């Protein structure tokens, strides 16, 4: 999509996450305070292997932590009755939650998130503010793609001088399962309390970049009552905007749309790919355990590579797919084979 080589992409996302690692290095609550450099994050080695190509271990969320955070949500009246000082009050100015198509095969492409775009637009509109009026961000960072997609859809540069995290992000601060955003909101409360009137924006992301949410926080009281829009209003538009048709019985000429190569402790184990048939329909596949093929798919960009796909075994009732291109693929209960073509 971006037109980069494998090496160029590694360097770009290494630099992106080095900025997160630097924030974590200065955060006493962070789990990994090493301050990894872009080169350390991108370099593949025994201590930093690929998990799912093109992402190394240091580009993945770190769930091996022991962390907790808490928030108290209440009304102004209750806060007053409890005697909580007003300088500690933080208001939610704008919020929205959306989701992209649950089935990845239903999406128009794999380099955008309409749900994040809409969540950002709705939250900013509710808060009567704009991106240039936000003083601090914490962008959900389970993997580089989550950050890149959020920035793209929000209209935020990945090297914005305001920074993209206040904690250090999931790989370095820590990724405590579904609880990370509790930490980012709690830290954002500290930030806006330290700079009264400043607005902070927090994003969250779940599943396969599926569920998206945005919240905007400030110590300044909103100028209007808290009244978020019914999410069904904008979610129905997202639901109707489907991508191309998919097939579970892929046969014929095929092109790789996108892919990843999964690794175990021994190295590359299999690839998962989304492919297109000549009629434009999409299929899901994975490769056989072919070390030569998998090494090629890691060393070179195979997006757009062409070949053939057919089901395996060839006889019903449980046919799957056999072909000439890359190696076996699973679609539902089917097994699909893509063998390398001579052209690639």
Say what each PLM segment does.
Residues 208-210:
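Gly/Pro-rich active-site capping loops and adjacent beta-alpha segments
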Residues 1-65, 69-71, 76-78, 84-172, ...:
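Conserved "HGTGT" condensation-loop signature of ketosynthase/thiolase-family condensing enzymes
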Residues 177-199:
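Phosphate/diphosphate-binding loops
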Residues 205:
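Conserved anion/nucleotide-ligand pocket segment
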Residues 135-136, 199-201:
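Conserved beta-strand elements of the Class I
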């Amino acid at each position: 999509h971006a037109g980069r080589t494998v090496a160029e992409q590694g360097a770009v996302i290494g630099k992106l996450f080095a900025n997160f690692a630097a924030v974590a290095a200065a955060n006493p609550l962070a789990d990994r305070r090493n301050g990894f450099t872009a080169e350390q994050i991108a370099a593949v080695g025994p201590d930093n292997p690929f998990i799912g190509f093109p992402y190394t271990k240091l580009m993945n969320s770190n769930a091996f932590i022991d962390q907790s955070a808490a928030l108290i949500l209440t009304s102004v009246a209750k806060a007053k009755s409890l005697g909580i000082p007003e300088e500690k009050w933080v208001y939610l100015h704008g919020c929205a939650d959306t989701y992209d198509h649950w089935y990845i095969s239903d999406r128009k492409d794999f380099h955008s998130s309409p749900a994040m775009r809409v969540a950002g637009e709705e939250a900013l509109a509710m808060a009567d503010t704009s991106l240039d009026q936000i003083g601090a961000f914490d962008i959900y960072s389970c993997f580089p793609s989550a950050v890149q997609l959020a920035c793209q859809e929000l209209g935020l540069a990945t090297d914005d001088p305001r920074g993209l995290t206040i904690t250090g992000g999931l790989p370095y601060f820590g990724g405590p399962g579904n609880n990370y955003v509790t930490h980012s909101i709690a830290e954002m409360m500290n930030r806006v309390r330290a700079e009264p009137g400043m607005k902070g924006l927090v994003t969250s992301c779940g599943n396969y970049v599926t569920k998206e949410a945005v919240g905007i926080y400030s110590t300044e009281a909103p100028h209007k009552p808290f009244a978020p829009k019914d999410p069904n209003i904008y979610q129905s538009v997202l639901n109707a905007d489907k991508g191309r048709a998919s097939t579970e019985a892929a046969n014929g000429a095929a092109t790789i749309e996108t892919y990843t190569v999964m690794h175990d402790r021994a190295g590359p184990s299999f690839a998962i790919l989304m492919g297109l048939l000549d009629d434009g329909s999409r299929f899901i596949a994975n490769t056989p355990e072919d070390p030569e093929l998998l090494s090629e798919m890691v060393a070179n960009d195979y997006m757009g590579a062409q070949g053939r796909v057919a089901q395996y075994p060839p006889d019903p009732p449980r046919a799957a797919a056999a072909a000439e291109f890359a190696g076996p693929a699973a679609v539902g209960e089917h097994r699909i084979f893509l063998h390398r073509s001579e052209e690639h």
